[in-house]
Amino acid sequence: MKLKDRVAIVTGGSQGIGEAIAARYAAEGAKVAVVYHANDAVAKQSVDKIKSAGGTARAVKADCSKIPEIERMVAEVRDAFGGVHILVNNAGVFRTVPVSETTEAIWDEQLDLNLKGAFFCVKAVLPEFMKNGGGKVINVTSIAGVGAFPNCPAYCASKGGLEILTKALATELGRYKINVNSLAPGNVATPLNAHLRGPGNEAYLKLMQTMTPTGRDFMSVDEMTGAAVFLASEDSSGMHGATLLVDAGWSAW
């Protein structure tokens, strides 16, 4: 078990990539805080799955775009599990909106959660990491933060910002044995992009299939978990400010 006796916070942990990472971390021996925003029933279901498989997990409700809620969430996890060793900044929002229709509210919603929230989650866990003599931060970014796509300028800005924030944090925190790295998924089937996979999207899906050497449109959430475990374990002790692209080869082209 690569994460035995570690305590991990996974934001956006009740569904999609976050749910898969939380389950895999628990299977690797970690105590996992499944942080979610709104749906109590979905969060309970995710935690129950982990517990039924023999893992340890706790659902923690918080809006990770709000600093007071982030601070409360981290305190709750610390008090429940005795500390924090791993932070996965996975909570995020994605809107497909062209430049001409992007309002201040649409912009702020994505930047506040995807970028600002991630930073303040790191700040909130920092005292625990310093107490432990180290820690692991995994920022879940996107190929949209490494390249760019039309009709989602706020999302691209938020994920691109998170990529450079990862490097900035690594340069400052590496001396304290805190590893800060990013995991950049390609197209992964999650609730955030369900609207792109339904009826009427055949042309889009066909286009996606031409953009990877593997000929795939969407990957599964489970394909993200191996990289997430690696970045949370001692196997990645020499990595600081790096980006792991798990994108079915998209970035190779």
Positions of predicted regions on the chain:
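Active-site helix of classical SDR
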Residues: V122, S158
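Residue(s) in the substrate-gating loop at a strand-loop-helix junction
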Residues: S142
